[in-house]
């Protein structure tokens, strides 16, 4: 059996992630220690008094990007040896049931980074991210909602989360 799955979610809106994962089946699974989900506000790793997480696009253009510094600091603090960092982005690999099964079976530790604005600074993708995921061919206001979809699909495949294992198929 795989090691217990621990998921750290980095978002500008951690309450959007925590609320749907705190009740019902996933809340009970968390209470029973079958998986651990921790939601963090990226602003907690900023160093300025305004807790600024966004910056203008390098070279100009419309929109803003998530700054790399707080993301690097957060991942450095949370990362373990077996950690995989996943970025929720419309440009990523399309999430499906087989990928959910792969993530559930591997156990270990995931850090899910929820994109926002026009995305994240490219240095984050190049240096930290192991996998870019999308939940479909559409754009959401931020990656928090997408991360809940991924977490729910993965968690229900962990043995013991559902009352009847046949329900996970």
Q: Which functions belong to the PLM regions below?
A:
Residues 120, 124-169:
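Structured adenosyl-cofactor binding patch, chiefly the S-adenosyl-L-methionine
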Residues 1-78:
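N-terminal nucleotide/polyanion-binding subdomain common to many enzyme families
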Residues 50, 97-99, 123-125:
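Short, well-ordered secondary-structure micro-motifs
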Residues 2, 102-106, 132:
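Solvent-exposed alpha-helices and their adjacent loops that cap or buttress functional pockets
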Residues 43-48, 93, 139-141:
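A short acidic, often aromatic-flanked loop/helix-cap motif at beta-alpha or helix-coil junctions
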Residues 66-116:
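S-adenosyl-L-methionine/SAH cofactor-binding core of RNA-modifying enzymes
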Residues 8-10, 38-40, 84-86, 110-111, ...:
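Hydrophobic/aromatic beta-strand patches that form the interior of the parallel beta-sheet core
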Residues 41-43, 89, 136:
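Residues at the C-termini of beta-strands that transition into short coil/loop
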